[in-house]
């Protein structure tokens, strides 16, 4: 019986998502400074634009360099895929805007980064999305705050800046009992210290500016999907499960 090869955290952090260049054998990931890509045929182009096969069509959407980052963080988190963004706040906003719309509701820990609090408390209400803030130490408070229009539960692994510890397994149980996903900001802990998917979270986002980069000279963010939440079965997220008309 053959054994499935698995790699440790250090190996994944160095090599996940990247292969040596097949033409030159170069080990390091290049920075692909391109906006467009070459297609083998009209049929090949059509299959890419119709998302029938993997590949790149335009760097605003995907890029080979960015794809390495996305695959690497997804591997470190134990997720099925990731999307890189221009900042951590962009990652948070992307996750929420994908799942929620006007008339929807979020239950959030109140011990969260100030920028995220402002997004939830001031910006999103302009678009018809309301948030109820609760004590992160009390999973029952999350359950009590859920409304018929609630679409998402949210918290941070460690609250910024007070380092409040969220009981992710208990809050995820609350979310799943109501058919809802749990989104976690894991910026403070990174996959090295905490992997929220193993504790029941469904989505994770990071500000890559902090501990992921480790040097404070870049701005970036990522959203990672665990692959465990049944988006179709929940019946609450048609933007993910139904075609655009």
How does the language model describe each region?
Residues 2-3, 13-15, 19-22, 82-245:
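Conserved PLP-enzyme active-site core in the AAT-like
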Residues 2-63, 71-72:
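N-terminal "arm"/small-domain region of PLP-dependent enzymes with the aminotransferase-like
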Residues 41-93, 115-122:
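Conserved N-terminal alpha-helix of the aminotransferase class I/II PLP-enzyme fold
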